[in-house]
Amino acid sequence: MSKSKFERKKPHVNVGTIGHVDHGKTTLTAAMTVVLAEAFGGDARAFDQIDNAPEEKARGITIATAHVEYETSERHYAHVDCPGHADYVKNMITGAAQMDGAILVVSAADGPMPQTREHILLARQVGVPYIVVYLNKADMVDDEELLELVEMEVRELLSDYDFPGDDTPVITGSALKALEGDDSEIGKPSIIKLAEAMDEYIPTPERPVDQPFLMPIEDVFSISGRGTVVTGRVERGVIKTGEEVEIVGLKETQKTTCTGVEMFRKMLDQGEAGDNIGALLRGTKRDEVERGQVLCKPGSITPHTKFECEVYVLSKDEGGRHTPFFNGYRPQFYFRTTDVTGSCELPEGVEMVMPGDNVKMTVSLIAPIAMEDGLRFAVREGGRTVGAGVVSKIIE
C-alpha cells in the first residue's frame, strides 16, 4: 500500500514545521510521513533522511530545507522542515517555501522558548495565515495540569502576535512514540488528529489562476502598425484579449486595453498564471511603459513608496556585506524586475545591523512600486544582493 502513487486529484496545500530548536520538529515531520503513509498511502521518510537536508539556493541565499510530502483523506500536502534556526529565518523571509499554514511544535516539557516566540513573530511578519499547534513530548510530562498550563501559554503567545490563540487547534502527543508505532492516545492517534486539524483549520489556498491578473513587465517593444507590446511571465490570474488592464508603478497609473496576447509567436485568446506572454496594448506609447511596472486587473493593486518590512541581511560568507549598516542606509530594493533606491529607518534602540542578522525596518522608496503585503524583494548594492526581505505592512 505504502508505495502507491499519489492521487493528484486531491487539493494541494503547502505547510511546514516551525518552533524552538530540539522541540521535535524533525521527529514530528518523520512521524507524519510514517503514520500517514500507513493510513492513506505515500512514502514514509526516516528521521535522518529529513535531518540531512540538502542545501538549495533561493535568491542567492543558501538555505538547508527538507521537503517531504504526505496525504490525508482530504488533501495532498507538501511539507518543509529546516535543520537550523537561521535556515527558518531565511526560508520564511525569502518565501523559498511558501506556507499556506504552519505546524508550531512546542515541547510540553519545556513550554514556549525564545525561538517559539521568534517563529510566531516571523510567521506574522511574512504572512503565514494559519498556525496549528502540536504539543510534543507529552510522554515526558506526568502532570495533566502542567500540560494545560503549557497549552495556555502557547495560546497567549499566539494571541500576542494577532493569531487567534483561543481558536487555534492544539494537539497533544509524542512524535517519538508515534514514530515507534505506539498506539496509545499520544502516539499514532495524535498524528491522525493533527492531520484532521490541518484539513479542517487550514483553508485550501486560492489557485494562482483564480487570483486577480498580474504580470510584472520585463520588456517593452514597439511593433510598427500594431502598437506597443509588453512581455513577462504572468504571476497570477488570466488575461483575455479585449480586457481592460492597468499599468501600475514608477509613474502615474494608466488604464489601457489588451488587444492581443501572444505566446511563442502565436496569437492566443488568453494567457494565464505561469505563461510567458507578450501583451499588445491599445494606444499605449512605447515610452509610457517600462520594465519594473506591472500589468494588472484594474484596481487590484496600488503603488506605494513607504512600508514596514522584515529583512534578512546576508552574512559575509554568503557574499553579503562585510560591515554593519546604520540608520539612513540607502541601498537598492529589487522588486520583481527592477531596482528602486530607498532609505532605511531602523527600529528604536537598534543602532546597527550586522551581516547575518534579521531586522524589522521601515523603507521609503524614491519611486512607487505596485505593492501588497507579503511581496518579496532583494536588497542590493550596485547589482550585488546583500539581503532579502518581505513587505509586512504598507504605510503610504
Curated annotation (Swiss-Prot):
EC numbers, comma separated: 3.6.5.3
Gene Ontology molecular function: any one: guanosine tetraphosphate binding
Function summary: GTP hydrolase that promotes the GTP-dependent binding of aminoacyl-tRNA to the A-site of ribosomes during protein biosynthesis.
UniProt region (G4), positions on chain: 136-139
Region spans: G2: 60-64
Gene name per UniProt: tuf1
Chief location category: cytoplasm
Subcellular location: Cytoplasm
CDD domains documented for this protein: EF_Tu, EFTU_II, EFTU_III
Region (G3): 81-84
Keyword Nucleotide-binding: yes
Catalytic activity of the protein: GTP + H2O = GDP + phosphate + H(+)
UniProt subunit comment: Monomer.
Name of the protein in question: Elongation factor Tu
Region annotation (G5) ranges: 174-176
Region span, G1: 19-26
Segments traversing the membrane: none
Keywords on record: Cytoplasm, Elongation factor, GTP-binding, Hydrolase, Magnesium, Metal-binding, Nucleotide-binding, Protein biosynthesis
Residues annotated for Mg(2+) binding in this entry: T26
EC class name: hydrolase
InterPro entries: EF-Tu_GTP-bd, EF-Tu_GTPase, EFTu-like_2, EFTU_2, G_TR_CS, P-loop_NTPase, Small_GTP-bd, T_Tr_GTP-bd_dom
Assigned GO CC terms: cytosol
Residues the record lists as binding GTP: 19-26, 81-85, 136-139
Family: Belongs to the TRAFAC class translation factor GTPase superfamily. Classic translation factor GTPase family. EF-Tu/EF-1A subfamily.
tr-type G domain span: 10-206
Pfam families according to UniProt: GTP_EFTU, GTP_EFTU_D2, GTP_EFTU_D3
